Amino acid sequence: ARICFKNNLPFQFLWMSQQAIEKYIKCILIFNRFPVKNIGHNLVAGIKKINDIPYIKLDLSDKSIYFIEYLNDQGPNRYFQKVMYTNGFEIITLDRTVWELRRYCRLLNYQLKTPKGELIDMLEVELRKIEHSRNVPPHKYKITDGYLEKRLKDNKYNHGNILTWKNLYFGKTKKNTIKIGRS
């Protein structure tokens, strides 16, 4: 999606953005042992299903919620069956939405066994990690052994550069501003 945006391919950008967000939504459901059947490409239905998980209070900004609804409408329009529109700043909102969803892409409700055989519930610890992530600069949030973190580190296939291009939420350093030209 990021490459499509960079190369001024708005139709493809929207479709790939929709696909990316769909994968994050389904990842959250799978990690939390909830079925992903009957969602298809419907992002709003996926978010509804996540909100049905009793211990998850999905903390998404209004901009991300709006963007998910926008992608739900525009993303599947890859065959140009209806009017497509963009405002030119979708890359920023995609990055924000990915960052907000990605924090939940982990096993949350599990137990660890101590050497003494005691079981420790980790749900509260994991939920606190998610809550705490809002209090640190976004670029400092890392998923241990995460795919994006690996690509940022090794820059294999130039992925690190693609991931960090005009990305306020992911990278090695904090970005306060970015410039986006509009055509």
Q: Where do the protein language model's features map onto the residues?
A:
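Contiguous, well-ordered alpha-helical segments that form the cores/surfaces of helical PPI scaffolds
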Residues: 19, 27-28
